Design a protein with these regions (language model features):
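N-terminal Rossmann-like or analogous alpha/beta NTP/dinucleotide-binding catalytic cores
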Residues: 43-129
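A structural preference for short, hydrophobic beta-strand core positions in alpha/beta folds
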Residues: 34, 74, 135-136
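N-terminal catalytic cores of NTP/NDP-binding nucleotidyl/phosphoryl-transfer enzymes
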Residues: 1-56
């Protein structure tokens, strides 16, 4: 049972397609397989228009497995593949995937050279090979269907609640704690720093959420700044995720070299430059108080 799609973000719309494949695999004692690409096709065809990805290939594969896929095929999207006519796509799948039974897609699925193929052509082509095609209905949130592009826009605007609803889970920032300049500790707000800079990322600002230590699975509440630290950095620098834990941690378990995973629950404010360090300290304390209040019911 083959689920087809780009699956960037593995949002609730994608999950509807994946669920069809899982249901069919269970019904026919088959295998649920996801077929996707490691990069967006536009990266090759229209690089100036290629959208930033919500997930790298490894993270996408991990989430596809979490949603019930038993195998994940990341087909390289090269020039040769981009020139495949839509009428030859199903034949290609049958030649490369033995015992293919069912194709599961979303209503807006497109395939083949110049994106000519749609769900109707796929059904016609599949019939010739004795395959069935199942089309998942679109999932909606707010004023329209859920899509990766809507999630990217919501991220850029700090609308974390909308992002989490469309993903069907909390948005995650993950990485290894790296050494910092200890300014946070000096001013009374020690931080755990992650060099985290994906293609598509949240707007620079302050967030509240829960942080998970991937070594021991402990979760603690935190407030975090994601950005370029304009008060402290006088020249351009790479974005940094600075996490301040809201409870006193075991410093042996929460330290440099540990992998952390932060889920974003609330956007507090945009990042800004302060005229004086005391102004920054006062704002961080205010952010901390707000985060404690917001996270206490969780």
């Amino acid at each position: 049972m083959l689920a087809l799609g780009m699956f960037d973000g593995v949002h609730v719309g994608h999950q509807a397609v994946l669920n069809l494949a899982v249901e069919q695999a269970n019904a026919f004692a088959g295998t649920a397989v996801a077929f996707s690409f490691p990069m967006h096709p536009s990266t090759l065809l229209r690089p100036e228009q290629a959208p930033p990805l919500l997930m790298n290939p490894e993270t996408k594969a991990k989430h596809l497995i979490l949603k019930g896929m038993q195998e994940v095929i990341l087909q390289p999207f090269d020039h040769e593949f981009s020139q495949m006519e839509a009428t030859g796509f199903v034949e290609f799948l049958c030649a490369h995937i033995p015992s293919l039974h069912t194709l599961c897609i979303g209503k807006n699925f497109r395939f083949g050279k110049n994106r000519i193929g749609d769900h109707l052509l796929l059904q016609e082509s599949a019939n010739a090979f004795g395959l069935q095609v199942l089309v998942a209905e679109s999932e909606s949130w707010g004023d329209g269907p859920v899509s990766s592009s809507r999630i990217r826009a919501a991220l850029e605007e700090g609308r974390i609640g909308d992002v989490n609803q469309m993903l069907g889970r909390k948005y995650l920032m993950e990485g290894m704690v790296c050494s910092g300049n200890a300014v946070g500790r000096t001013i009374g707000f020690p931080t755990l720093n992650l060099n985290w800079n994906p293609q598509a990322h949240p707007c620079f600002g302050v967030y509240a959420g829960m942080v998970k230590n991937l070594r021991n699975d402990q979760k603690l509440p935190a407030v975090a700044n994601y950005g370029v630290r304009p008060t402290l950095e006088k020249s351009s620098c790479e974005p940094l995720l600075e996490i301040h834990l809201l409870v006193e941690p075991d410093t042996e378990q929460w330290r440099t070299g540990i992998e952390l995973q932060m889920e974003l629950d609330f956007f507090l404010r945009p990042e800004k430059a302060f005229a004086a360090l005391d102004d920054l300290k006062a704002q961080i304390q205010s952010d901390k108080n707000q985060a404690l209040e917001l996270l206490s019911p969780l």
